[in-house]
């Protein structure tokens, strides 16, 4: 119901009000104005204003590009003055707020967005109303990007039938070894691991699926992905039908990796926004934010928990792997992918990370010629301090190297007991014996980039997925190919692309 200000009764004859009546008339008018304002819908910064600023303003006034000495990607930055020194926001007074005045400026050289279509009248009115209502911030943290605090997006349904296959960058085998979940276009497809038949489709998810994790019971899935350069998201949902959903996190760029602690109570994430985030289970199925770490200068490509959950391990495209404590503090940095001397010298981006089941060893790989095997505690000792720098440089270090010789690098690592698996950009899956690093088997050439890898020790099965959307199931004891299919509903694998010829 819309409240309207009380209307004065106007007599048929024109009567000049007495001086004594004027205060009562003014009181009625003010009361009517207050009623109208009270009925006006409250404008939300996070819901209504942040999407406008993100879409039209942060391209020139964001964290990297700064026009007019002004950023507005966080609420704290938004409130600061730019080169004009005029107040950006004067709560309650749009006409004294540079943010509003620049939107209605008639001069195209000073109007914002500059040299672009102006905001619509409705959008400008929304900004004006928000400032007039007090310019309140209703997000979680005014110091971090408000794009990462905007409401989750509504995702479209996936295509009923795929016209072309999409790269499958994420795969996960259910704890009981019966199913494998694969990333699709706005969906996760779930297949029978024994027969390769499609079981169900979990739809209305982010455009690109980058990481999938089953919770220990197998009843819930955690799915991460987004849209490159624009949006990231983590969703928790029922594995059976995609119901009971919780958007655990939104981010301003792709979420590339998620990992679940061994006790199933903690979740870590990392991605293209260069932030590691941690979440804690709240009750049975809900997750709440715990902490974040912003120590990274490039994309975070993989996260994992160490044995016993004593560390959160982070692989980064900045040539380092960092080790964090369960509370998010930096424990040490592993620099074995950027060496000046020795046979493994060079600077190499890290794409893959895995940990030893029940042991302290960590495995990292990416570009370069070898997989590195190292331990967090020993890496901390070797880092030492400036006082013992010369002595440390003279030492060989504890890292062991397993050659892979993949010119395109290694994109995924996985461990199973005393076995290490590496999926390469050349299309080959390599299997090593631990701890010596002896190459036990090189699986048949799949002639495509391998993007996804999952291993299930109990059933002796490994799943690989390719850039072309092909999923293959392997026997890890014999190296035999069990099944292969195109993970795109409605399409079938071209016979010429099959490794198992009829």
Question: PLM features: residue spans?
Answer:
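N-terminal secretory signal peptides that target proteins for export/translocation
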Residues: 1-19
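Secreted/luminal cysteine- and crosslink-motif detector
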Residues: 5, 14, 29, 58-61
């Amino acid at each position: 119901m819309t409240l309207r200000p009380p209307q004065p009764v106007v007599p048929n004859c024109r009567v000049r009000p007495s001086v004594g009546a004027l205060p009562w008339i003014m009181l009625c008018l003010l009361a009517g104005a207050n009623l109208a304002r009270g009925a006006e819908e409250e404008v939300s910064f996070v819901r209504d204003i942040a999407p406008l600023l993100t879409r039209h303003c942060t391209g020139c006034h964001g964290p990297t590009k700064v026009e007019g000495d002004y950023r507005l990607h966080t609420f704290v930055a938004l409130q600061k003055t730019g080169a004009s020194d005029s107040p950006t926001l004067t709560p309650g007074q749009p006409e004294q707020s540079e943010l509003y005045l620049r939107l209605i400026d008639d001069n195209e050289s000073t109007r914002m967005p500059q040299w672009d279509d102006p905001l619509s009248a409705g959008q400008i009115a929304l900004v004006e109303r928000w400032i007039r209502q007090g310019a309140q911030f209703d997000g979680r943290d005014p110091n971090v990007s408000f794009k990462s605090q905007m409401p989750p997006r509504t995702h479209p349904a996936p295509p009923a039938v795929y016209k072309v296959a999409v790269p499958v960058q994420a795969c996960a085998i259910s704890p009981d070894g019966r199913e494998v979940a694969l990333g699709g276009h706005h969906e996760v497809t779930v297949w029978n691991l024994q027969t390769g038949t499609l079981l169900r489709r979990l739809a209305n998810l982010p455009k690109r699926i980058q990481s999938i994790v089953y919770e220990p019971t197998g009843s819930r899935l955690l799915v991460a992905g987004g849209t490159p350069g624009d949006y990231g998201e983590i969703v928790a949902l029922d594995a059976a039908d995609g119901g009971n959903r919780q958007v655990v996190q939104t981010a301003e760029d792709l979420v590339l990796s998620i990992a679940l602690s061994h006790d199933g109570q903690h979740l870590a994430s990392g991605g293209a926004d260069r932030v590691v985030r941690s979440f804690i289970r709240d009750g049975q199925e809900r997750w709440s934010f715990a902490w974040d770490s912003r120590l990274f200068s490039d994309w975070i490509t993989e996260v994992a928990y160490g044995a016993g959950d004593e560390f959160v391990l982070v692989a980064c495209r900045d040539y380092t792997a960092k080790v964090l404590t369960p509370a998010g503090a930096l424990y040490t940095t592993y620099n074995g992918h950027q060496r000046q001397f020795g046979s493994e010298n060079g600077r190499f981006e890290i794409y893959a990370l895995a940990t030893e089941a029940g042991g302290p060893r960590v495995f990292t790989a990416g570009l370069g010629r070898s997989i590195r095997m190292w331990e967090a505690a020993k890496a901390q000792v070797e880092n030492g301090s400036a006082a013992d720098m010369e002595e440390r440089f003279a030492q060989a270090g504890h890292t062991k190297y397993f050659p892979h010789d993949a010119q395109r690098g290694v994109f995924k690592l996985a461990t199973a007991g005393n076995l290490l698996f590496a999926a390469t950009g050349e299309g080959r899956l390599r299997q090593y014996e631990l701890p010596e690093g002896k190459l036990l088997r090189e699986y048949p050439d799949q002639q495509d980039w391998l993007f996804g890898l999952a291993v299930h020790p109990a059933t002796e099965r490994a799943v690989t997925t390719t850039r072309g959307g092909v999923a293959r199931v392997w026997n890890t004891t014999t190296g035999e190919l069990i099944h292969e299919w195109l993970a795109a509903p409605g399409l079938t694998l071209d016979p010429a692309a099959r490794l198992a010829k009829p």
